[in-house]
Structure formats: structure tokens, C-alpha cells
Amino acid sequence: MRPRPAGALRAGAALSPVLLLLLLLQLLGHLWAASTPAPSSLSPGTQQDNQLGAGRVKRGWVWNQFFVVEEYTGTEPLYVGKIHSDSDEGDGTIKYTISGEGAGTIFLIDELTGDIHATERLDREQKTFYTLRAQARDRATNRLLEPESEFIIKVQDINDSEPRFLHGPYIGSVAELSPTGTSVMQVMASDADDPTYGSSARLVYSVLDGEHHFTVDPKTGVIRTAVPDLDRESQERYEVVIQATDMAGQLGGLSGSTTVTIVVTDVNDNPPRFPQKMYQFSIQESAPIGTAVGRVKAEDSDVGENTDMTYHLREESGSGGDAFKVTTDSDTQEAIIVVQKHLDFESQQVHTVVLEALNKFVDPRFADLGTFRDQAIVRVAVTDVDEPPEFRPPSGLLEVQEDAQVGSLVGVVTARDPDAANRPVRYAIDRDSDLEQIFDIDADTGAIVTGKGLDRETAGWHNITVLAMEADNHAQLSRASLRIRILDVNDNPPELATPYEAAVCEDAKPGQLIQTISVVDRDEPQGGHRFYFRLVPEEPSNPHFSLLDIEDNTAAVHTQHVGFNRQEQDVFLLPILVVDSGPPTLSSTGTLTIRICGCDSSGTIQSCNTTAFVMAASLSPGALIALLVCVLILVVLALLILTLRRHHKSHLSSDVDEDMRDNVIKYNDEGGGEQDTEAYDMSALRSLYDFGELKGGDPGGGAASPPQAASSSERHSLPRGPSSPEPDFSVFRDFISRKVALADADLSVPPYDAFQTYAFEGAGSPAASLSSLHSGSTGSEQDFAFLRAWGPRFRPLAALYAGHRGDDEAPAS
């Protein structure tokens, strides 16, 4: 293929200087390509010649790689190049065609000359090259003269795309006071032009706005600080405009820009400062502990955690600053001054403290800027209030003997007015704490006396509340809690711990221990109890039993002689005198009940003469009550069951009376089936019957007359009734025999195993047949009104048949 100049354009085409330069470069490339032979891989005609044989003239393609400039704006199609076959002699017998990307739409070929033109405006940024295939055919026969050859049309780039920043918006940050040259961030632009062709995609960066504070690397786009004194407190945000220019920044290059937001972050370079050097507050002397006196806040120009601070109180000498403490509000960073001791206007009216604020986090890099703390003076004035009287002490313990007479002095309480006026005080007892008014108080002196008799055993302690109020202002009221302990006196005699009962065998030995006795005393002497046991003075000795004081507040009872006879005496009563140690000494008498019982050889009690002893020994009163309750519950359950059963029986009997007129007849006669077949000999079904032998047969073999149906008298039910005599079984046998003979003689009778349905239910029923066929007949003149008299259960049936009959007769009337 012989190349044609690709720059052959019409003279009237108007081109820009840049386009003319590019076309000139393209023309020089084509001239150089024409002087160089095409590679063997791009000459398919050689392969075809080898296939046709050695006697044929060698032919092949002559062609070049084509180029076309993008963004062509001319009005005529742009000449791309020419394809040509060596066999083309210029007589028009060869037809050139192309196929592939853009063939027939973007690229058109002259079939006679092989000239290719571009008809559309191309954009290299959308598609860089097009791959097509060329064919040369005989115009007359459409025979392929050369093998199909592939070629490429490349779109040549021009600088028509400006740089773009694709990853915006850009936001960076840098700490304040950072040194010069500190890297902030990097921005990068992209250019859609061909980076391998010319300088259309070579970019350089520059700062359009903000160059006083920041710089940018021309090649990498890294933004750095230009000054070392960036101060967030002066300016927190900077808007820097960065520009990217292609053609390596040369004249005529295209450019694009973006805005970069740079935020200056805070560092702790500012100490806290109090807006004023003295603060004054006032608080009432009655303020409780924990009351907030006031709030003070030190200002800090920093932000975030750099403003976190703590506060401390430092007391001035003798100023009473220990009455307050300071806490820090973590949300507002305020100092809260709080009362931590009770204030007293009369003792100190003004408190002065030094409040100090300091940062929590101090950056050592800025230690040379000074101390990161500040101080202020805080003065707190205590204001006077009318306070209620004060008890001294506010609570106390009093003691009184339980045998004290009414009006006896228990103790004295004292209260005074803490105010400077020192008004007189009046006293009273809060009756909610002394509902029974056991104690009284003198309103002027505060002396507490007994108002009623005391009993330690009933109430050993009393807690009362005493009120103190100003004489002329009862609203100023204070309270004091008093605990009064009742001291014990020996006013209760000792008693046996329980009503003792003992048992002794008839064959007991002398000196055998029967019972150990202990006592109780409601009193509580300071030195402890000491009890003494002896027999009553009326019977200082007992011939049967002896009493031994063990001297540990218990006593033991022993037998005096050998054996007892319960036939003569089965119960002995032994009175025992118990005396306490006083003072004064008190005593009481208790009785030990001793029962004589029969024992076995091992000494185990077998029986005693009284069941009371057994009950007392084995069952407590609570157990007896529980036993009685159980018995009562069982009796109630039995009565309830009997009542329910009687009620159930009465209900059943009423149902029986109501259904006395209901008669239900059920017929379950269903002959045939497999059971009947198994019960009979099947050979009998195949045997022939001699009708002549049954009745009216001709012994000569004449035709037998058909069997006659039984008369109506034979179908009547047999008479029955209570006065009927004992039936004759021969009558039944004759009746059954006749029925069997008739059935055997009837040719229409089905086999034994056939299913038979008998709708006839016998004569004598007032309602006649209840067959569905018969009862549904409209011709029946049966009157079913009598069904209503049979009770509630037959009323729906009577209404059904009565209504049906009425519907049938309605048209006739």
C-alpha cells in the first residue's frame, strides 16, 4: 500500500496555529513511515501468495498507521489517510471497504481510491484509538483479492483539558505555634490529557490566596506553614486557594484551582485568669453543711481539654477558712464554694479564703510562657438569723428506779437561746413520743418527773422527745432525744420454771433422782440471781422424797425408800419453797406432782393410772387445739359430701320421672354378611329345593303351585300381658317352621348372605311405620298432633310433621 499525505486538506479549511503545527508534525511522521518497509506481520498479502503457488505474481497491502487530531472543528470531513493494494492499477476494478470500530459512522472510505475521512469530532479523553480492518475485493466478482488486514487509527492529543482537583473539598489542620515548614496536608490534581505526549499533563502547583501563611510544593502539592506564629486565639481558620497549571506552567497552559480550609488546632498556651481579684458572698449562719455559697469561674482562652482546671482553697491566717471547701463543676469548669462546717454569726461574721485556679494539663513546651495558675480573694459574710434554742447536750441518758413515786425527779434538761438576745426558753414533752404520759416536765426549769407508776418488767426503756422553744416565739423550736432507763428493784418473787410433773417406778430404789427443779424470776438484780430451795415450813420433811439444793439455782428431788405401791397411792404432791437473794427477799411455793407408774425390768415406764399425765407429757395445748381443728374439718367435709350426693340423687330421680313416657325401640336385625356365610354350609345355597314336598306339590312331577303369602292374621304380634298364661312352645315351633318353608319355597328370596332391609315394624303401633319412605309420603292422613302430649322431647317432631302436613294441604283448600 502506498501512503498518501494525511495532511492533504482543502485550502478553504481554517486551522489554528497549534493545529497547523500538529498537522506538520503528522506529515513528517508519514513521510518517514513511507520510507520504511512495512513489517511482515502487517503484510497479509505475502501469506496469500504462498498459498496460491509460485507461478503467481506476488501482491500485498501497502499501508501506514494513521493518526487523526482530536477536537477537529472544520466543516469538511478530516482526511485521515489512504489504503492501497499493489494490484490496484487505477482502473476502478478494486473495491476498498473497512470494518471495525467507527467504520461507516465515524470513518468513511472511498471505495475507488481507498481514502479514509473522519466525519465526526473526536475526543482522545474518551477514546484514544480505533481498531479497523481493511479489505480489497474485485468489484465485478466481489472476490477477496487480499487477506483482510487490521490497522489502527490513533487520536492525537491536544491540550484541551484543564487540571481538576477531584478529591475536594479539602480540609486540613495544623497546631498553633507550629514551626515554619510544618506539613499541613497534600492536594493533588489530575489532567485528562495524554501524559506521554508533550507537556499537556505536566502540572505545577502554586498558592493564589493565603501565601502569607502557607506555601505549596510546586511538584508534590504538599502545603506547609510559612510562619511560626500561627495563633488560634487570633485566627482559627484559613481559606487557602491552590492552583494547578499544565504545560509545566508555561505560557498558554490551562489551569484549575481549589480552596483548602486549614483549621488551626489549640494547644495549652494560655493560663487561667480570674476576671476579678476579689469576690464577696454572704450566707446565713443556719445554712446546713453542703450548702453552696457561690460560684467563681476563671477564664481560659484555650478550648477543649486545655481549659480543664482545678480549684483549691487556701486559708488566710486566722480567717476561719476551714469552714468551706471547693469543688469543680466538670461541665462548666466553675469553682463551687461549699459549707463544710456549721457557721455561727456570734463567733465569726466574716471568713476570708484564697481561691487558686490551675490547668489540669500543662504542656512543657510552653513552660517558658509563665505559671499556668491564678489566684483570687473570696470573702464570705455570715448573716445572723433567729435560731431556735440549743440543747446542751442535744441528747442524753437518764435513769430512775421502777419503784419511784409519782412526781419523783428523773433528771433536768438544759437549753439556751444562741442569739445575742438570749431570750428565755420554755420546755415541753412531745406527747407523740410519750402517749401514756408517763413523764412530765417543768416548762421553766426543764426538770423531768414521773407522771405515773413505773414497771421495769413491762417497759425497761422509754424514749421521749423534749421540746425547747423561745418564750415569745414558739416557732423557734428545737428537739432533744432522751433515753430513760428504768432501774430494777426486787419486786417479783421467784417461781418454778414450769408446772413440774414427775414419774417414778413402783420398784424405785432409795436415792433415785426423780426431777431437777429450776426457777425463773422477772427481776434482774445487778449481782445476778441466787435462789434457795427448801420444803415448806408446814412439812419440813417428807417420808417419801427428799429435796437437795445444788446451789446453782437448781434443786434435785430423790426417793427416800424402796418401792411404791400405786394401788395404795398413785400420786404424791411435794410443796417446794423458793426464795431469792433480795433485797428484800421474796419467795413463792410451787408443787411437784409425782406419779407412781408400772415399769419393766429395764426401768422403762409402761403405764400409769391416769391418762391426764400421759396427755400432759406428750401433747401440748397447741397440739390439742390442732387435733380438734382437724377433727372439725373432717366432720365438715363428710357433711358436705353427703349433701352433694343427696342433691345428685334427687336430680337423677327428677330426670327419670320426666322421661317415663319416652319409649325408644331399636331394631338391629341386619341379616347377611360374612358372619352368616361362615356360620352356614355354602353347599346348601347350591342345592335345589323340591317345592312339591313343601305344600300342594304334585308327586308325579307336575308343576308346583307357587307358595302363598302368609295371611294377615299370621303377621299380627302375639298377645302379651301380665295375665297371659305360660306360652306353648309348640306354637312357636310351628310358626317358625311355616315361615322357613315359605322362605325356602319362594324363588325371589335372596341367598343367605344377602343384606335385607325390613321396613315393616309390626302392627299395633299408634304411629304406624316410621319408615322414611312412608313418613315422607304426602298422601298420608296420619294425625301427629298426639306427639305433643308425649312431652317436651317430642314437641319439635310434632311441629315438624304438623307443619309439613299443613303445607301439603294448603293448595287443596
From Swiss-Prot:
<dbReference type="GO" id="GO:0016477">
    <property type="term" value="P:cell migration"/>
</dbReference>
<dbReference type="InterPro" id="IPR015919">
    <property type="entry name" value="Cadherin-like_sf"/>
</dbReference>
<dbReference type="GO" id="GO:0007043">
    <property type="term" value="P:cell-cell junction assembly"/>
</dbReference>
<keyword id="KW-1133">Transmembrane helix</keyword>
<dbReference type="GO" id="GO:0005912">
    <property type="term" value="C:adherens junction"/>
</dbReference>
<feature type="domain" description="Cadherin 2">
    <location>
        <begin position="166"/>
        <end position="274"/>
    </location>
</feature>
<dbReference type="InterPro" id="IPR002126">
    <property type="entry name" value="Cadherin-like_dom"/>
</dbReference>
<dbReference type="GO" id="GO:0016339">
    <property type="term" value="P:calcium-dependent cell-cell adhesion via plasma membrane cell adhesion molecules"/>
</dbReference>
<dbReference type="GO" id="GO:0016342">
    <property type="term" value="C:catenin complex"/>
</dbReference>
<keyword id="KW-0472">Membrane</keyword>
<feature type="domain" description="Cadherin 1">
    <location>
        <begin position="61"/>
        <end position="165"/>
    </location>
</feature>
<dbReference type="GO" id="GO:0007156">
    <property type="term" value="P:homophilic cell adhesion via plasma membrane adhesion molecules"/>
</dbReference>
<feature type="topological domain" description="Extracellular">
    <location>
        <begin position="34"/>
        <end position="621"/>
    </location>
</feature>
<keyword id="KW-0812">Transmembrane</keyword>
<feature type="glycosylation site" description="N-linked (GlcNAc...) asparagine">
    <location>
        <position position="159"/>
    </location>
</feature>
<dbReference type="GO" id="GO:0000902">
    <property type="term" value="P:cell morphogenesis"/>
</dbReference>
<feature type="domain" description="Cadherin 3">
    <location>
        <begin position="275"/>
        <end position="391"/>
    </location>
</feature>
<dbReference type="Pfam" id="PF01049">
    <property type="entry name" value="CADH_Y-type_LIR"/>
</dbReference>
<keyword id="KW-0130">Cell adhesion</keyword>
<dbReference type="Pfam" id="PF00028">
    <property type="entry name" value="Cadherin"/>
</dbReference>
<keyword id="KW-0479">Metal-binding</keyword>
<feature type="domain" description="Cadherin 5">
    <location>
        <begin position="496"/>
        <end position="613"/>
    </location>
</feature>
<feature type="topological domain" description="Cytoplasmic">
    <location>
        <begin position="643"/>
        <end position="813"/>
    </location>
</feature>
<dbReference type="GO" id="GO:0005509">
    <property type="term" value="F:calcium ion binding"/>
</dbReference>
<keyword id="KW-0732">Signal</keyword>
<feature type="glycosylation site" description="N-linked (GlcNAc...) asparagine">
    <location>
        <position position="463"/>
    </location>
</feature>
<dbReference type="GO" id="GO:0008013">
    <property type="term" value="F:beta-catenin binding"/>
</dbReference>
<feature type="signal peptide">
    <location>
        <begin position="1"/>
        <end position="33"/>
    </location>
</feature>
<feature type="transmembrane region" description="Helical">
    <location>
        <begin position="622"/>
        <end position="642"/>
    </location>
</feature>
<dbReference type="GO" id="GO:0044331">
    <property type="term" value="P:cell-cell adhesion mediated by cadherin"/>
</dbReference>
<dbReference type="InterPro" id="IPR039808">
    <property type="entry name" value="Cadherin"/>
</dbReference>
<keyword id="KW-0325">Glycoprotein</keyword>
<dbReference type="InterPro" id="IPR020894">
    <property type="entry name" value="Cadherin_CS"/>
</dbReference>
<feature type="domain" description="Cadherin 4">
    <location>
        <begin position="392"/>
        <end position="495"/>
    </location>
</feature>
<dbReference type="InterPro" id="IPR000233">
    <property type="entry name" value="Cadherin_Y-type_LIR"/>
</dbReference>
<keyword id="KW-0677">Repeat</keyword>
<feature type="region of interest" description="Disordered">
    <location>
        <begin position="696"/>
        <end position="726"/>
    </location>
</feature>
<comment type="function">
    <text>Cadherins are calcium-dependent cell adhesion proteins. They preferentially interact with themselves in a homophilic manner in connecting cells; cadherins may thus contribute to the sorting of heterogeneous cell types. PB-cadherins may have a role in the morphological organization of pituitary gland and brain tissues.</text>
</comment>
<protein>
    <recommendedName>
        <fullName>Cadherin-22</fullName>
    </recommendedName>
</protein>
<keyword id="KW-1003">Cell membrane</keyword>
<dbReference type="GO" id="GO:0034332">
    <property type="term" value="P:adherens junction organization"/>
</dbReference>
<dbReference type="InterPro" id="IPR027397">
    <property type="entry name" value="Catenin-bd_sf"/>
</dbReference>
